[in-house]
Amino acid sequence: MKRFAGRPAIVTAAASGIGRAIALRLHEEGAQVLAVDIDDEGLAALPRSETLRTFVADVTAEGAPQAIVGECLRRFDGIRVLVNNAGLGNCPPFHETTEAEYRKYADINQKATFMITLAALPALTRSKGVVLNIASTLGLVGYRRQAVYSMAKAGVIGLTRNLAADYADQGIRVNAIAPGIIATPQTAGRLNTARFHATIVGTTPMGRPGRPEEIAGAAAFLCSDDAGFVTGQVLAVDGGQTSSAYISEALVQCWVDAHPDR
């Protein structure tokens, strides 16, 4: 028996990367998936079927949350799983951030998660469903030049914990995943530079970036009955990056070579 057999699921930002991997994994395990994205070409590349449908939407647009939820109810007559994956990184430094830029990053990284979950709440209450928010390790720790993004993702983590407390008595579970550096089309440009790749290897105990399928595996667990007693949790899937102040011997040696007098 597949873990998600007949269970309707919404996955946002599902045209590529982490969202695509989650949508395909849930569908592989039996879910009826509505894959949502603003990228119509990316959605068209998904292997659509009667149980894997696509919906083009800008999650930050007025009325989009209600439209997304309405489409899932129309297609599949319910919502059992909601995966809020839409996000936007590469924000400007704090001192260069305009109000318009702040709103752009806050809207997609935080407001969309809030509003889509709010729109889906009645259906999730009926189904005793699951919400999974894709946050970031930058919502757990500080990092240079990521103030707006980190603030938004920290807010998603706070929302996750509060919703878990608020709706546990109605049978709804709410968890989050905090991915580290994952090899996706969005990160390919940076990962393909030797310096950035060396830095990731040098600060991650597992010595490599993660794969979207590894986030999807964690997502499938948290959304399934196997995690039936898990709520309000944030699972870092980051190769151990946030578990310690890990620095590889190679990076230590680089520092020594650069400061031979110390």
What is each PLM-predicted segment?
Residues 176, 195-230, 237-239:
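C-terminal helical subdomain
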Residues 122, 165-169, 228:
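Alpha-helical segment proximal to the catalytic Tyr-Lys
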Residues 141, 231-262:
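Short C-terminal tail/terminal secondary-structure segment
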Residues 136:
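Residue(s) in the substrate-gating loop at a strand-loop-helix junction
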Residues 117, 152, 160:
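Active-site helix of classical SDR
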Residues 93-94, 101-103, 200:
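Substrate-binding pocket helix/loop in short-chain dehydrogenase/reductase
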Residues 95, 141-148, 169-170, 207, ...:
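Active-site loop immediately N-terminal to the catalytic Tyr-X3-Lys motif
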